[in-house]
């Protein structure tokens, strides 16, 4: 994976129709502009991958995080559709239309930014935003990718550990690839250090932090 950033991303072509005619495959494409200009003061984000640690730390309080004086410590929030059903995120992302449907029905997607695949954008016009560059990674890893893509200098993760259920055994390697690619970004994995994959902790731009230290460090 190559480190790419929103500031250099004008948009991309997506396939809107594909069919066979006369023995040849014909496709129609449409250009999708980058509609997001993400201005962040602190350069800090928190990514909530699951609610595994909710008994230790209630992640929902992050929806009202102010970030101290002039918002200098404010965290932009990223997470999946499951987390978006629990709290308002700055940026939600999911690839499963079944997870996204509740966000349409309760008007969440009408008032907040929700990313998904080109297919889902076409199925529900006007409801979602296209995942930039559409990397081949699992849903739970996408919030980390988006936070890095948006150019944050510090990314804190909640709910990411060895036991996180994702439905794929490759997800730990996918996180490792993102951390390696965005080598100038510091990734802080919040939780029990002994429950974090060794591959992550071996990288020079990672660190761990328990929940108490996270609360103090980020003025939550």
Q: What name fits each language-model region?
A:
Residues 1-220:
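Metal-ion/cofactor- or nucleotide/acyl-coenzyme-handling active-site neighborhoods
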